[in-house]
Each structure stands twice: as structure tokens, then as C-alpha cells.
Amino acid sequence: MAFETLHCMQKQNANTHSYMALKLDMSKAYDHVEWSFLEELMRKMGFNERWINLMMMCLKSVTYSVLVNGEPCGMIHPTRGIRQSDPLSPFLFLLCTEGLNGLIKQAELNGDIHGVSLCRKGLKLTHLLFADDSLLFCRSNLEECDKVLEILNIYEGALGQKVNRSKTVLFFSKSTTTDARAQIKEALGVPEIMHYEKYLGLPSFVGRGKKVSFNYIKERVWRKLQSWEGKLHSQASREVLIKSVIQANLTYTMGCFKIPLGLCHEIEVLIKKFWWGQRGDRRKIHWLKWDEMTKSKMVGGMGFRDLALFNDSLLAKQAFRLLHNQDSLFYKVFKARYFHNSSIMEAAASRMGSYAWKSILKGRDVLLCGAHWKKKLKFGNIIGCQVNILHK
């Protein structure tokens, strides 16, 4: 979602409104959470009064002691904050972000800020929130910049949580003037980014150099293998490390983007060298081809993943989500932009489409290889049903 919105901003025409994206990093200040704010927030969200009282009892029953010469002394009763070791704390902390969500929605309803329009007369996005990472979208002018600052100041004052400005960055659409950029950067006190900044561990922009954008995956695999290289590992332990650590860590990125085949091959080369015990420049004989090792153990292989095929299967899962989860924001955004008059199965590739969309189409092609699909047929007032039967 974030990638698609930033791509839309990057490709906007000069004659449209200019927009900016503010990537916020909220500090995890568990000890700054105001109890009164959390209590009132739960009440506004419609929680039962008995439930609210139970939650507040859990928060207010905490006491602390200070060790003096190894002996606990005193009994401190806190008036704010939530315990980091409490299993409830992460969920209560996430509830607090609903306050920011409400402030942004109210500002949008009042016309104080305007979200990014992803297509003509279509859906507009003002913010995306995930854990302590947030993306805010608005027009790149001082009026809306001041409103965003006001919202953040209200939120910080009520909750006690602070914006980590050292990790907060700005991105502007092409149509934003140089003067407007300078004024907004000065007002917010955060730097501007251009390319290859990450959001939730993934690159926010992917240009023509796909390998450059995703080369961090190979570097991460290489560092992990280097840390294991000096240790003595049996073949069984190497198998476990490859399957449960190296190949499992690739799942997140491969589930969103199509990784270049050359990069997949280079990562597989690193895995092969580790499997056969090669260290540094010392060469080892590879007794079995990689294609054979990716086969199931039932047919003589090792059950390692073919990374290119694994990538395609994960992208097919995203296409399947677009096919069936039609109430999600994920579906609404992509349908409005790419297949508003059809379904994902009939959608055509767009020259101006984002790399995320092109990657999903690769997964869609996998579904088409193993599915029978028929469009809706209309006979008078009778509309036939869609048929999509997986036969493989």
C-alpha cells in the first residue's frame, strides 16, 4: 500500500496538486503513556465500562521499589506509563494510535488536509499506520504542514509519546516547487529523501536498477553466513540453518516484489557454498546439482527452495488475495488503479504501473496456469456466475 501510494505521487503530472509524504517514527515510550488518555480513548471506542475498569486496575496496581545496597527500599506508585514486560502492554500501546487516526480523520472531514488521490475520482489516502511506523499524506503547502504539526503536538501532549525526528523523513511529489520544499523542511525540521529509503524493511521506491534496490537481501544473507562460517557445523545443522533462517528470512520481501533472477541465483550460490563447507577461497566439490537439491527428499533431493519459484508462489498468494478479499483496502486501491472494470484475472499490464503491481501480475500468471476461469455471462436479466476452479 505504501509503495503504491508513493509510486502514484512520483508519477503525478505537473498540473495536478502537489503532495508530500511524511514518514513518522514514533518512539516506543511505554513509560510516557498517560492513563487518563488511554482510559478516555477506550471509552470513545465503545469498550464496556467493566472492561475499562479492569484494564485500568491492571495499570494502576503497579508498584516499584529501588535497590539500595542490594536491598529493595520504598514503594513507588506511578501515575502514568505501562509495563514493558506485561503481555497486555503492546496491545494497549497500539490502541493509543487510534487517537492519531481519529485526529487525522477529523482534519480530513473539516477540509484541513487532503489525501493523495490514487486515481481520478477514486480513493484518497491520508495515512497508513502500522505499529510505531506511520505514513501521513497531504498537500505540500504550509497550511497543511502547519495542520499536521498541530495534530502531532496534540497527540504528543495527550499521550506523552514523541516523534523520533532523527528517523522521520519527507518525500515530495514532482510538482512541488523548490521554495515549498524548503519552507516545509524548515517547519518540520526533518530531511527529504529521494530514492531507496526503506519503509517496514522494504524499499519505498524501485527504479530501473532492480538489482541495486534489492541487493541488501544478498548482503544480509552473506553476513549471516559469514557469522556461521568459522564454526563447525554438521550437514544436519547446515540444513536447519539454511531452511529455518536463510530461506525463511527471504519470505517477507519475496511476498511483495519479484526479485531479479540474477540476484536469486547469486543468493543460491552463497547457500551452495555454505552447504558444501566452502570457506573463503578454498574450493569444494559440489557433489549434486542445485536443481536436484531443490527436489523433495522423497525423490532424492534435500528439500531446499528454488528461490525464483518460491518468489512466484508468494506473489500468487497476493494475487489470490486480490481475487477473494474484496473488502480490504488493499483490494480497493489496486482495483481502482488497475482493473476497475474487470477482475485481477483479466487485468492487463500497465506501462505506468508500479513495480508492486507488475510483481503481482507475475503471481497472477501462476494462478492462470492452474485455474479455469470464465467471465460473468449475461442473458437478459440473468447473470451467470464466475467459475474459478483450481485443478492443480
Task: Mark where each language-model region is.
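A helix-boundary/hinge signal
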Residues: 1-392
